[in-house]
Amino acid sequence: MWEPYRLLDPAGTVVEPVAVYLKDLQGIGRPATTQRSYGMDLLRWFRFLWAVEVPWDQATRDEARDFSRWIQISDKPKRAGAPAAAAVPNPVTGKAGPGRKYAPATRGHSESVLRGFYDFHRDAGSGPMVNPFPLVRRGSRAHAHHNPMDLHRNERSELYRPRHIQRVPHCIPDEKFNEVFAQLGSNRDRALVAFWVSTGARASELLGAHYGDADPGQQLITVIRKGTRAIQQLPASPDAFVWLRLYQAQMHGLVPTRVDDPLWWTLRRPFIALSYHAAYRMFSRANAALGANWSLHDLRHTAAYRMARDPDMSLTDVQWVLGHAHLSTTQLYLNPLTEDVIAQALAHHARVAAGSVAATTVPKDGPSPLSYRSEALNILFGEGTA
């Protein structure tokens, strides 16, 4: 049977408990990308256990606690020669870099994966009966006194799970987007970016499109949604199809054009389907020319903000285009952008400095602008009217 990924110990032997768990994930329909993500979390945990010389099935809450402490202070491994990334805001985009430490979202994902791993082996009878990653023990059930008129709030259930930090989606301003677009070096790259910023599709969804999925006549492109694997047609801008046609004319006769052939190819021989990593490097090169650090996913955020700010487009329509399961996720794009708020605040300070906005200082002579009328005070304290 085909196994997308295997976890090996220092001797090069397959770690059988992880192999069984990954097979179960494959059996319930989890994609290879999910198996890889779970495998990386398990590799981090097993490396910790190998360092402290504790077998995986003898790990206790103490090891889980120490692992949670270690992952907070440990530096992420990096490739040889790669520069150290600093978690400081980029001067162009305002986005902070990934930094040297593990992000709270990474630590939370790791805790959930490891708890699920031990739950699986406990249910299968092949692991310890007590999960080393416990849940939070409370004296009452969750949402015991919840007001039915309010939305349910997420409650922390895992003991060692870090506090969730709501990340603000980043949008590429129109003038900066034009500068990034001007740095793209081929019609294929321009077509890809134009589709991403007009459809709001995820990077992997658009890269997985086939030749027959593009319908210029209806101005639609078909993608397979991440997670649900649902097939959905997405409307795209006219200029995206113009760039697509120029790219197809450039590659005519060089790549196959059957209906089920890939839509996106590399530009050099041997021609192979364009991968996510190649597209990521393409967009990174365009960013580097401007000193920016926007990601491919920021193009999806940009499309979402543009559609959500259109008064003639309902929020439910935006939800359908983006493929969100809950409307509350789409509502994030109704919040003002950070750069817009900063610009408004700076403009306010400029107006105050210019004297066009009245200052709220109390004059030295004369009554305070917030003082009560003397007649009201006389009536209040029983002195009558003057």
Segment roles from a protein language model:
Residues 177, 237-292, 384-386:
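Active-site/catalytic core of tyrosine-dependent DNA strand-transfer enzymes
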Residues 348-386:
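C-terminal secondary-structure termini that scaffold catalytic or DNA-interacting sites
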Residues 164-203, 207:
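Basic, Lys/Arg- and aromatic-enriched nucleic-acid-binding interface segment
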Residues 225, 322-347:
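Catalytic-site neighborhood detector that most strongly recognizes the C-terminal catalytic loop/helix
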Residues 199, 204, 208-242:
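Conserved tyrosine-mediated DNA breakage-rejoining catalytic core shared by Y-recombinases
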